[in-house]
Protein backbone atom coordinates (compact mmCIF):
# COMPACT_ATOMS: atom_id res chain seq x y z
CA UNK A 1 0.00 0.00 0.00
CA UNK A 2 1.11 3.54 -0.51
CA UNK A 3 1.91 5.66 2.52
CA UNK A 4 -0.66 8.24 1.42
CA UNK A 5 -4.27 7.20 1.80
CA UNK A 6 -7.10 9.38 0.47
CA UNK A 7 -10.63 9.30 1.78
CA UNK A 8 -12.72 9.88 -1.27
CA UNK A 9 -34.55 29.67 19.79
CA UNK A 10 -36.38 26.90 21.74
CA UNK A 11 -35.81 28.42 25.19
CA UNK A 12 -35.14 31.98 26.32
CA UNK A 13 -32.24 32.62 28.63
CA UNK A 14 -34.68 33.49 31.40
CA UNK A 15 -36.44 30.16 31.07
CA UNK A 16 -33.18 28.25 30.98
CA UNK A 17 -31.75 30.17 33.91
CA UNK A 18 -34.89 29.65 35.96
CA UNK A 19 -34.59 25.93 35.38
CA UNK A 20 -30.99 25.98 36.48
CA UNK A 21 -31.80 27.91 39.62
CA UNK A 22 -34.63 25.60 40.56
CA UNK A 23 -32.34 22.62 40.07
CA UNK A 24 -29.73 24.13 42.34
CA UNK A 25 -32.00 25.17 45.18
CA UNK A 26 -33.05 21.63 45.97
CA UNK A 27 -29.59 20.53 47.11
CA UNK A 28 -30.17 21.15 50.83
CA UNK A 29 -27.09 23.34 51.01
CA UNK A 30 -24.75 20.37 51.08
CA UNK A 31 -21.06 21.13 50.73
CA UNK A 32 -19.99 21.13 47.11
CA UNK A 33 -23.12 22.75 45.70
CA UNK A 34 -24.21 25.88 47.49
CA UNK A 35 -23.08 25.22 51.03
CA UNK A 36 -19.74 26.37 52.34
CA UNK A 37 -17.82 25.85 49.12
CA UNK A 38 -17.09 29.54 48.59
CA UNK A 39 -16.59 30.59 52.16
CA UNK A 40 -19.43 33.07 52.63
CA UNK A 41 -22.13 32.79 55.23
CA UNK A 42 -19.91 31.20 57.89
CA UNK A 43 -20.94 31.31 61.52
CA UNK A 44 -20.32 34.73 63.02
CA UNK A 45 -20.76 36.62 59.78
CA UNK A 46 -23.83 38.79 59.12
CA UNK A 47 -25.66 37.94 55.92
CA UNK A 48 -26.75 41.08 54.08
CA UNK A 49 -28.00 39.52 50.83
CA UNK A 50 -28.45 36.27 48.96
CA UNK A 51 -28.08 35.55 45.28
CA UNK A 52 -30.91 34.01 43.29
CA UNK A 53 -29.13 30.65 43.62
CA UNK A 54 -29.12 30.93 47.41
CA UNK A 55 -25.50 31.93 47.98
CA UNK A 56 -25.18 34.11 51.09
CA UNK A 57 -23.28 37.42 50.94
CA UNK A 58 -21.89 38.71 54.22
CA UNK A 59 -21.23 42.27 55.29
CA UNK A 60 -17.49 41.52 55.24
CA UNK A 61 -17.48 41.10 51.46
CA UNK A 62 -15.88 43.62 49.11
CA UNK A 63 -18.70 45.43 47.27
CA UNK A 64 -17.92 46.79 43.80
CA UNK A 65 -19.71 50.02 42.83
CA UNK A 66 -22.65 49.36 45.18
CA UNK A 67 -24.44 52.56 44.10
CA UNK A 68 -24.11 51.92 40.35
CA UNK A 69 -27.23 52.05 38.20
CA UNK A 70 -28.02 50.32 34.92
CA UNK A 71 -25.70 51.39 32.13
CA UNK A 72 -22.90 52.66 34.36
CA UNK A 73 -19.28 51.86 33.47
CA UNK A 74 -17.85 49.94 36.42
CA UNK A 75 -14.50 49.07 34.81
CA UNK A 76 -12.32 51.07 37.19
CA UNK A 77 -14.11 49.95 40.33
CA UNK A 78 -13.96 46.31 39.25
CA UNK A 79 -10.28 46.48 38.34
CA UNK A 80 -9.38 48.10 41.65
CA UNK A 81 -11.34 45.53 43.64
CA UNK A 82 -9.58 42.61 41.95
CA UNK A 83 -6.08 44.10 41.87
CA UNK A 84 -3.98 42.38 44.53
CA UNK A 85 -7.15 40.98 46.04
CA UNK A 86 -6.73 39.49 49.55
CA UNK A 87 -6.80 35.73 50.05
CA UNK A 88 -10.28 34.24 50.54
CA UNK A 89 -11.98 37.49 49.57
CA UNK A 90 -15.61 37.60 48.43
CA UNK A 91 -16.02 40.31 45.79
CA UNK A 92 -19.63 41.26 45.05
CA UNK A 93 -20.83 42.91 41.85
CA UNK A 94 -23.96 45.09 41.88
CA UNK A 95 -27.39 44.24 40.53
CA UNK A 96 -28.16 45.47 37.04
CA UNK A 97 -26.55 45.63 33.61
CA UNK A 98 -23.24 47.49 33.47
CA UNK A 99 -20.54 48.19 30.92
CA UNK A 100 -16.91 47.12 31.18
CA UNK A 101 -14.43 48.52 28.68
CA UNK A 102 -11.27 46.48 29.19
CA UNK A 103 -10.19 42.97 30.11
CA UNK A 104 -10.27 42.24 33.82
CA UNK A 105 -7.10 40.30 34.67
CA UNK A 106 -6.64 38.56 38.01
CA UNK A 107 -3.23 37.12 38.85
CA UNK A 108 -2.55 34.33 41.36
CA UNK A 109 -5.66 34.78 43.47
CA UNK A 110 -6.18 32.38 46.36
CA UNK A 111 -9.63 31.46 47.63
CA UNK A 112 -11.34 34.27 45.70
CA UNK A 113 -15.10 34.27 45.19
CA UNK A 114 -16.37 36.67 42.51
CA UNK A 115 -20.14 36.85 42.65
CA UNK A 116 -23.00 38.84 41.29
CA UNK A 117 -26.58 38.66 42.52
CA UNK A 118 -27.76 36.08 39.99
CA UNK A 119 -27.29 34.77 36.49
CA UNK A 120 -29.89 37.28 35.24
CA UNK A 121 -29.46 39.85 38.01
CA UNK A 122 -25.87 40.95 37.35
CA UNK A 123 -24.92 41.39 33.70
CA UNK A 124 -21.59 42.77 32.53
CA UNK A 125 -21.62 44.06 28.95
CA UNK A 126 -18.20 43.91 27.27
CA UNK A 127 -19.39 44.98 23.81
CA UNK A 128 -17.28 48.14 24.05
CA UNK A 129 -14.23 46.46 25.55
CA UNK A 130 -10.77 46.87 24.01
CA UNK A 131 -9.46 43.58 25.40
CA UNK A 132 -9.87 40.07 24.02
CA UNK A 133 -11.03 38.34 27.20
CA UNK A 134 -13.75 39.64 29.45
CA UNK A 135 -12.17 38.02 32.53
CA UNK A 136 -8.80 36.29 32.62
CA UNK A 137 -7.64 34.46 35.74
CA UNK A 138 -3.95 33.56 35.61
CA UNK A 139 -2.60 31.16 38.19
CA UNK A 140 -4.00 30.88 41.67
CA UNK A 141 -6.13 28.34 43.49
CA UNK A 142 -9.60 27.86 44.91
CA UNK A 143 -11.29 30.44 42.66
CA UNK A 144 -15.09 30.65 42.34
CA UNK A 145 -17.01 32.68 39.74
CA UNK A 146 -20.76 32.66 40.24
CA UNK A 147 -24.15 34.30 39.85
CA UNK A 148 -23.38 36.66 36.99
CA UNK A 149 -23.56 37.00 33.23
CA UNK A 150 -20.83 38.08 30.83
CA UNK A 151 -22.19 39.41 27.55
CA UNK A 152 -20.60 40.27 24.20
CA UNK A 153 -16.96 39.63 25.05
CA UNK A 154 -14.71 40.50 22.08
CA UNK A 155 -13.09 37.05 22.14
CA UNK A 156 -13.47 34.91 25.29
CA UNK A 157 -15.91 35.22 28.15
CA UNK A 158 -14.23 33.87 31.29
CA UNK A 159 -10.79 32.35 30.83
CA UNK A 160 -8.85 30.66 33.62
CA UNK A 161 -5.31 29.42 32.99
CA UNK A 162 -3.05 27.40 35.29
CA UNK A 163 -5.49 27.43 38.20
CA UNK A 164 -5.63 24.61 40.73
CA UNK A 165 -9.26 24.62 41.75
CA UNK A 166 -11.64 26.63 39.55
CA UNK A 167 -15.40 26.60 40.14
CA UNK A 168 -17.76 28.31 37.71
CA UNK A 169 -21.41 28.11 38.72
CA UNK A 170 -24.67 29.91 37.90
CA UNK A 171 -22.72 31.94 35.37
CA UNK A 172 -23.68 32.85 31.80
CA UNK A 173 -21.67 33.83 28.77
CA UNK A 174 -23.82 35.23 26.01
CA UNK A 175 -23.47 36.68 22.54
CA UNK A 176 -26.94 37.96 21.79
CA UNK A 177 -28.63 37.56 18.42
CA UNK A 178 -27.77 34.97 15.81
CA UNK A 179 -24.74 32.69 15.84
CA UNK A 180 -22.19 34.53 13.67
CA UNK A 181 -18.50 34.13 12.91
CA UNK A 182 -17.64 37.46 14.54
CA UNK A 183 -19.09 36.36 17.88
CA UNK A 184 -16.55 35.61 20.57
CA UNK A 185 -14.74 32.28 20.56
CA UNK A 186 -15.02 30.61 23.98
CA UNK A 187 -17.59 31.23 26.67
CA UNK A 188 -16.48 29.50 29.88
CA UNK A 189 -12.87 28.57 29.28
CA UNK A 190 -10.67 26.81 31.87
CA UNK A 191 -7.31 25.90 30.36
CA UNK A 192 -4.24 24.07 31.70
CA UNK A 193 -5.91 23.77 35.08
CA UNK A 194 -6.61 21.13 37.71
CA UNK A 195 -9.72 20.39 39.74
CA UNK A 196 -12.22 22.06 37.44
CA UNK A 197 -15.88 22.20 38.50
CA UNK A 198 -18.41 23.63 36.03
CA UNK A 199 -22.06 23.49 37.05
CA UNK A 200 -25.40 25.26 36.58
CA UNK A 201 -24.00 27.50 33.84
CA UNK A 202 -25.47 28.78 30.57
CA UNK A 203 -23.50 29.39 27.37
CA UNK A 204 -25.06 30.94 24.27
CA UNK A 205 -23.72 32.10 20.94
CA UNK A 206 -20.00 31.22 20.99
CA UNK A 207 -18.35 30.93 17.57
CA UNK A 208 -16.17 28.18 19.03
CA UNK A 209 -17.14 26.39 22.25
CA UNK A 210 -19.68 27.56 24.79
CA UNK A 211 -18.27 25.47 27.66
CA UNK A 212 -14.71 24.36 27.04
CA UNK A 213 -12.15 22.61 29.22
CA UNK A 214 -8.72 22.16 27.66
CA UNK A 215 -5.40 20.59 28.68
CA UNK A 216 -6.68 20.03 32.20
CA UNK A 217 -7.09 17.21 34.73
CA UNK A 218 -9.77 16.24 37.24
CA UNK A 219 -12.87 17.78 35.72
CA UNK A 220 -16.60 17.70 36.45
CA UNK A 221 -18.97 19.41 34.01
CA UNK A 222 -22.57 18.95 35.18
CA UNK A 223 -26.02 20.53 35.07
CA UNK A 224 -25.12 23.12 32.43
CA UNK A 225 -26.97 24.29 29.31
CA UNK A 226 -25.14 25.10 26.08
CA UNK A 227 -27.29 26.57 23.33
CA UNK A 228 -26.55 27.85 19.82
CA UNK A 229 -22.77 27.66 19.97
CA UNK A 230 -20.60 26.01 17.35
CA UNK A 231 -19.55 23.45 19.97
CA UNK A 232 -21.83 23.22 22.96
CA UNK A 233 -19.51 21.48 25.42
CA UNK A 234 -15.95 20.50 24.52
CA UNK A 235 -13.33 18.51 26.41
CA UNK A 236 -9.97 18.86 24.66
CA UNK A 237 -6.66 17.13 25.48
CA UNK A 238 -7.88 16.59 29.03
CA UNK A 239 -7.81 13.70 31.48
CA UNK A 240 -10.24 12.39 34.10
CA UNK A 241 -13.36 14.28 33.01
CA UNK A 242 -17.00 13.57 33.83
CA UNK A 243 -19.61 15.33 31.69
CA UNK A 244 -23.13 14.61 32.94
CA UNK A 245 -26.65 15.99 33.40
CA UNK A 246 -26.08 18.68 30.77
CA UNK A 247 -28.29 19.97 27.95
CA UNK A 248 -26.72 20.68 24.55
CA UNK A 249 -29.31 22.15 22.21
CA UNK A 250 -29.18 24.03 18.93
CA UNK A 251 -25.39 23.99 18.56
CA UNK A 252 -23.52 22.81 15.46
CA UNK A 253 -22.10 19.96 17.55
CA UNK A 254 -23.54 19.15 20.95
CA UNK A 255 -20.78 17.53 23.04
CA UNK A 256 -17.22 17.02 21.76
CA UNK A 257 -14.12 15.22 23.00
CA UNK A 258 -10.99 16.09 21.00
CA UNK A 259 -7.28 15.42 21.16
CA UNK A 260 -5.60 17.94 18.87
CA UNK A 261 -1.93 18.06 17.86
CA UNK A 262 0.64 20.61 18.92
CA UNK A 263 -0.61 21.38 22.43
CA UNK A 264 1.44 21.38 25.64
CA UNK A 265 -0.67 18.54 27.02
CA UNK A 266 -0.38 16.18 24.10
CA UNK A 267 -3.30 13.91 24.88
CA UNK A 268 -6.10 13.22 27.31
CA UNK A 269 -8.27 10.28 28.26
CA UNK A 270 -10.70 8.77 30.75
CA UNK A 271 -13.56 11.00 29.60
CA UNK A 272 -17.06 9.91 30.64
CA UNK A 273 -20.07 11.49 28.91
CA UNK A 274 -23.34 10.34 30.47
CA UNK A 275 -26.95 11.24 31.19
CA UNK A 276 -26.86 14.29 28.93
CA UNK A 277 -29.44 15.52 26.45
CA UNK A 278 -28.02 16.38 23.03
CA UNK A 279 -30.81 17.33 20.71
CA UNK A 280 -31.46 19.52 17.70
CA UNK A 281 -27.79 20.46 17.26
CA UNK A 282 -28.24 21.68 13.70
CA UNK A 283 -26.88 25.23 13.69
CA UNK A 284 -24.69 26.36 10.81
CA UNK A 285 -21.02 26.02 11.66
CA UNK A 286 -19.44 29.49 11.59
CA UNK A 287 -16.27 28.43 13.41
CA UNK A 288 -12.64 28.44 12.32
CA UNK A 289 -9.89 25.84 12.66
CA UNK A 290 -10.70 22.25 13.56
CA UNK A 291 -13.96 23.16 15.30
CA UNK A 292 -15.03 24.67 11.99
CA UNK A 293 -14.96 21.13 10.57
CA UNK A 294 -17.60 19.84 12.97
CA UNK A 295 -20.53 18.80 10.77
CA UNK A 296 -23.68 20.74 11.62
CA UNK A 297 -26.20 18.29 12.96
CA UNK A 298 -23.81 16.28 15.15
CA UNK A 299 -25.00 15.19 18.58
CA UNK A 300 -21.57 14.09 19.80
CA UNK A 301 -18.16 13.92 18.14
CA UNK A 302 -15.14 12.01 19.41
CA UNK A 303 -12.02 13.03 17.46
CA UNK A 304 -8.69 11.24 18.05
CA UNK A 305 -9.40 10.81 21.77
CA UNK A 306 -8.84 7.45 23.43
CA UNK A 307 -10.46 6.24 26.62
CA UNK A 308 -14.00 7.63 26.24
CA UNK A 309 -17.22 6.16 27.64
CA UNK A 310 -20.56 7.48 26.34
CA UNK A 311 -23.64 6.10 28.04
CA UNK A 312 -27.24 6.73 29.08
CA UNK A 313 -27.52 9.90 27.00
CA UNK A 314 -30.55 11.02 25.01
CA UNK A 315 -29.36 11.96 21.52
CA UNK A 316 -32.15 13.07 19.23
CA UNK A 317 -33.06 15.20 16.22
CA UNK A 318 -29.52 15.85 15.00
CA UNK A 319 -29.48 16.13 11.21
CA UNK A 320 -26.12 14.46 10.51
CA UNK A 321 -25.51 11.82 13.18
CA UNK A 322 -25.98 11.05 16.84
CA UNK A 323 -22.35 10.09 17.51
CA UNK A 324 -19.38 10.29 15.14
CA UNK A 325 -16.14 8.58 16.19
CA UNK A 326 -13.26 9.57 13.97
CA UNK A 327 -9.50 9.49 13.75
CA UNK A 328 -7.54 12.60 12.83
CA UNK A 329 -7.00 10.97 9.43
CA UNK A 330 -10.32 12.45 8.34
CA UNK A 331 -8.87 15.90 9.04
CA UNK A 332 -5.42 15.27 7.53
CA UNK A 333 -5.18 12.20 5.30
CA UNK A 334 -1.56 12.63 4.20
CA UNK A 335 0.19 9.94 6.24
CA UNK A 336 3.54 10.61 4.61
CA UNK A 337 3.58 14.14 6.02
CA UNK A 338 2.82 13.17 9.61
CA UNK A 339 6.46 12.77 10.79
CA UNK A 340 7.35 16.24 9.51
CA UNK A 341 4.13 17.98 10.52
CA UNK A 342 3.35 16.24 13.79
CA UNK A 343 6.53 14.42 14.84
CA UNK A 344 7.18 16.59 17.90
CA UNK A 345 3.67 16.25 19.28
CA UNK A 346 3.58 12.53 18.46
CA UNK A 347 6.76 12.14 20.51
CA UNK A 348 4.79 13.53 23.45
CA UNK A 349 2.00 11.03 22.91
CA UNK A 350 -0.52 12.63 20.58
CA UNK A 351 -1.89 10.12 18.10
CA UNK A 352 -4.12 10.55 15.06
CA UNK A 353 -5.82 7.26 15.92
CA UNK A 354 -8.22 6.58 18.77
CA UNK A 355 -8.79 3.54 20.97
CA UNK A 356 -11.11 2.27 23.68
CA UNK A 357 -14.30 4.20 22.99
CA UNK A 358 -17.39 2.54 24.43
CA UNK A 359 -21.00 3.59 23.69
CA UNK A 360 -23.78 1.87 25.57
CA UNK A 361 -27.32 2.35 26.84
CA UNK A 362 -27.89 5.58 24.91
CA UNK A 363 -31.37 6.47 23.66
CA UNK A 364 -31.11 7.52 20.02
CA UNK A 365 -33.88 8.83 17.76
CA UNK A 366 -34.44 10.83 14.58
CA UNK A 367 -30.83 11.47 13.63
CA UNK A 368 -29.12 11.49 10.23
CA UNK A 369 -31.98 12.73 8.08
CA UNK A 370 -30.07 15.58 6.44
CA UNK A 371 -26.28 15.19 6.82
CA UNK A 372 -24.18 18.27 6.05
CA UNK A 373 -20.64 19.53 6.53
CA UNK A 374 -17.40 19.03 4.60
CA UNK A 375 -15.74 16.61 7.04
CA UNK A 376 -18.19 13.79 6.39
CA UNK A 377 -19.49 14.90 2.98
CA UNK A 378 -17.98 12.05 0.88
CA UNK A 379 -19.07 9.51 3.48
CA UNK A 380 -22.58 10.94 3.62
CA UNK A 381 -22.80 10.89 -0.16
CA UNK A 382 -21.82 7.23 -0.19
CA UNK A 383 -24.36 6.20 2.40
CA UNK A 384 -27.00 8.20 0.57
CA UNK A 385 -26.32 6.41 -2.73
CA UNK A 386 -26.02 2.81 -3.88
CA UNK A 387 -22.33 2.69 -2.90
CA UNK A 388 -22.82 1.39 0.65
CA UNK A 389 -22.86 -2.23 1.75
CA UNK A 390 -26.64 -2.53 1.35
CA UNK A 391 -26.55 -1.30 -2.24
CA UNK A 392 -29.34 1.25 -1.82
CA UNK A 393 -29.62 4.75 -0.30
CA UNK A 394 -29.58 4.68 3.50
CA UNK A 395 -30.21 7.17 6.27
CA UNK A 396 -26.83 8.28 7.58
CA UNK A 397 -25.79 6.02 10.47
CA UNK A 398 -26.69 7.26 13.92
CA UNK A 399 -23.39 5.84 15.22
CA UNK A 400 -20.53 6.24 12.75
CA UNK A 401 -16.94 5.06 13.15
CA UNK A 402 -14.44 5.80 10.41
CA UNK A 403 -12.30 2.71 11.18
CA UNK A 404 -9.37 3.86 9.04
CA UNK A 405 -6.85 4.34 11.85
CA UNK A 406 -7.63 0.92 13.28
CA UNK A 407 -7.39 -0.72 9.85
CA UNK A 408 -4.04 0.89 9.03
CA UNK A 409 -2.71 -0.14 12.45
CA UNK A 410 -3.90 -3.70 11.92
CA UNK A 411 -2.22 -4.03 8.51
CA UNK A 412 1.03 -2.59 9.89
CA UNK A 413 0.99 0.57 7.83
CA UNK A 414 1.38 2.80 10.90
CA UNK A 415 4.08 0.69 12.57
CA UNK A 416 6.76 3.18 11.54
CA UNK A 417 5.12 5.79 13.76
CA UNK A 418 6.26 3.81 16.83
CA UNK A 419 9.73 5.24 16.30
CA UNK A 420 8.31 8.73 16.87
CA UNK A 421 6.80 7.97 20.28
CA UNK A 422 8.84 9.20 23.25
CA UNK A 423 9.71 7.00 26.21
CA UNK A 424 7.19 8.56 28.60
CA UNK A 425 4.29 8.28 26.15
CA UNK A 426 5.32 4.76 25.22
CA UNK A 427 5.32 3.76 28.88
CA UNK A 428 1.79 5.17 29.08
CA UNK A 429 0.67 2.79 26.34
CA UNK A 430 0.82 5.01 23.26
CA UNK A 431 1.65 2.86 20.24
CA UNK A 432 0.70 2.05 16.66
CA UNK A 433 0.58 -1.72 17.03
CA UNK A 434 -2.37 -3.77 15.81
CA UNK A 435 -5.40 -3.23 18.03
CA UNK A 436 -6.02 -5.70 20.83
CA UNK A 437 -9.31 -6.26 22.65
CA UNK A 438 -8.75 -3.34 25.03
CA UNK A 439 -8.27 -0.93 22.12
CA UNK A 440 -11.53 -1.62 20.30
CA UNK A 441 -14.34 0.82 19.57
CA UNK A 442 -17.50 -0.75 20.98
CA UNK A 443 -21.22 0.01 20.86
CA UNK A 444 -23.99 -2.09 22.33
CA UNK A 445 -27.24 -1.99 24.30
CA UNK A 446 -28.14 1.34 22.70
CA UNK A 447 -31.86 2.00 22.35
CA UNK A 448 -33.67 2.68 19.07
CA UNK A 449 -36.28 5.28 19.98
CA UNK A 450 -37.35 6.07 16.42
CA UNK A 451 -41.15 6.17 16.13
CA UNK A 452 -41.96 3.42 13.63
CA UNK A 453 -42.93 3.38 10.84
CA UNK A 454 -42.22 7.07 10.23
CA UNK A 455 -38.46 6.60 10.58
CA UNK A 456 -36.02 3.94 9.47
CA UNK A 457 -34.23 1.76 11.99
CA UNK A 458 -31.30 3.37 13.77
CA UNK A 459 -28.10 2.09 12.19
CA UNK A 460 -24.41 1.71 12.96
CA UNK A 461 -21.93 2.61 10.23
CA UNK A 462 -18.33 1.49 9.74
CA UNK A 463 -16.65 3.40 6.91
CA UNK A 464 -13.64 1.08 6.63
CA UNK A 465 -13.53 -2.53 7.81
CA UNK A 466 -11.09 -2.91 10.68
CA UNK A 467 -10.10 -6.51 9.92
CA UNK A 468 -7.68 -6.74 6.96
CA UNK A 469 -9.36 -10.01 5.97
CA UNK A 470 -12.58 -8.10 5.27
CA UNK A 471 -11.06 -5.75 2.68
CA UNK A 472 -12.83 -6.25 -0.64
CA UNK A 473 -12.47 -2.82 -2.23
CA UNK A 474 -9.03 -1.46 -3.19
CA UNK A 475 -7.77 1.04 -5.71
CA UNK A 476 -5.22 0.33 -8.43
CA UNK A 477 -2.35 0.70 -5.96
CA UNK A 478 -3.84 -1.70 -3.44
CA UNK A 479 -5.09 0.95 -1.04
CA UNK A 480 -8.35 0.11 0.76
CA UNK A 481 -11.36 2.13 -0.29
CA UNK A 482 -14.34 3.08 1.87
CA UNK A 483 -16.63 0.08 2.22
CA UNK A 484 -19.44 2.07 3.88
CA UNK A 485 -20.65 -0.84 5.96
CA UNK A 486 -24.01 -0.39 7.67
CA UNK A 487 -25.91 -2.49 10.15
CA UNK A 488 -28.83 -2.06 12.53
CA UNK A 489 -27.83 -0.54 15.85
CA UNK A 490 -29.85 -3.00 17.93
CA UNK A 491 -28.43 -6.53 17.80
CA UNK A 492 -25.57 -5.09 15.78
CA UNK A 493 -22.69 -6.97 14.20
CA UNK A 494 -20.30 -4.05 13.74
CA UNK A 495 -18.73 -2.65 16.94
CA UNK A 496 -20.39 -5.40 18.97
CA UNK A 497 -18.00 -5.60 21.91
CA UNK A 498 -17.66 -4.23 25.43
CA UNK A 499 -14.98 -2.41 27.37
CA UNK A 500 -14.36 -2.07 31.11
CA UNK A 501 -16.10 0.89 32.72
CA UNK A 502 -13.97 3.99 33.18
CA UNK A 503 -13.18 5.46 36.57
CA UNK A 504 -15.14 8.48 37.84
CA UNK A 505 -13.48 11.87 37.80
CA UNK A 506 -12.69 13.42 41.17
CA UNK A 507 -12.48 17.16 41.80
CA UNK A 508 -10.86 18.31 45.02
CA UNK A 509 -11.90 21.92 45.54
CA UNK A 510 -10.98 23.58 48.81
CA UNK A 511 -10.46 20.16 50.37
CA UNK A 512 -13.95 18.96 49.46
CA UNK A 513 -14.62 16.20 46.95
CA UNK A 514 -17.00 16.76 44.04
CA UNK A 515 -18.45 14.41 41.48
CA UNK A 516 -19.80 10.88 41.56
CA UNK A 517 -17.53 9.79 44.41
CA UNK A 518 -18.08 12.99 46.39
CA UNK A 519 -21.02 15.36 46.76
CA UNK A 520 -22.99 13.58 43.99
CA UNK A 521 -22.63 10.11 45.47
CA UNK A 522 -26.44 9.79 45.71
CA UNK A 523 -27.11 11.35 42.28
CA UNK A 524 -29.07 8.97 40.06
CA UNK A 525 -26.80 9.57 37.07
CA UNK A 526 -23.81 8.40 39.08
CA UNK A 527 -25.41 4.99 39.60
CA UNK A 528 -25.84 4.33 35.87
Regions found by a protein language model. Give the residues of each.
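Right-handed parallel beta-helix/beta-solenoid
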Residues: 36-79, 97
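Extracellular beta-strand/beta-solenoid scaffold signature
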Residues: 78-79, 101, 126-136, 152-159, ...
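C-terminal motif of bacterial Sec signal peptides marking the signal peptidase cleavage site
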Residues: 21-24
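Bacterial signal peptide processing site
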Residues: 26-28
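Right-handed parallel beta-helix
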Residues: 111, 115-120, 141-152, 164-177, ...
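Short, T/G/N/S-enriched strand-turn elements that build extracellular solenoid repeat scaffolds
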Residues: 78-84, 99-108, 114, 124-125, ...
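N-terminal extracellular ligand-recognition/capping segment immediately after the signal peptide
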Residues: 68-73, 87-112, 119-128, 492-493, ...
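Right-handed parallel beta-helix/beta-spiral solenoid domain characteristic of secreted/periplasmic
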Residues: 58, 63-76, 111-155, 177
Amino acid sequence: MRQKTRLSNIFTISAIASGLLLAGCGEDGKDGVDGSVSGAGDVGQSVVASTTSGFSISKDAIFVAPDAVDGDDITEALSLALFDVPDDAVVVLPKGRFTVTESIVVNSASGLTLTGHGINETILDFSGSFGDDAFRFQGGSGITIRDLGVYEAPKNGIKATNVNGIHMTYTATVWEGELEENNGAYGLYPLKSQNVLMEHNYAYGSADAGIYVGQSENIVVRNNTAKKNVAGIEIENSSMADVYNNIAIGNSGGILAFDLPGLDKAYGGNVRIFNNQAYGNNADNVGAGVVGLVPPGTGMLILATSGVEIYDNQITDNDTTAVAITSYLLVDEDLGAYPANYGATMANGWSPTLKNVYLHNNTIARNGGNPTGDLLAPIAAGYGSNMNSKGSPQTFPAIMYDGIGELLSNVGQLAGFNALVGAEASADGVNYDPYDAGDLICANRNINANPAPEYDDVNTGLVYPTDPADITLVDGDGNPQPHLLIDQMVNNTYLNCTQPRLAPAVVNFKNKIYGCTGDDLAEAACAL
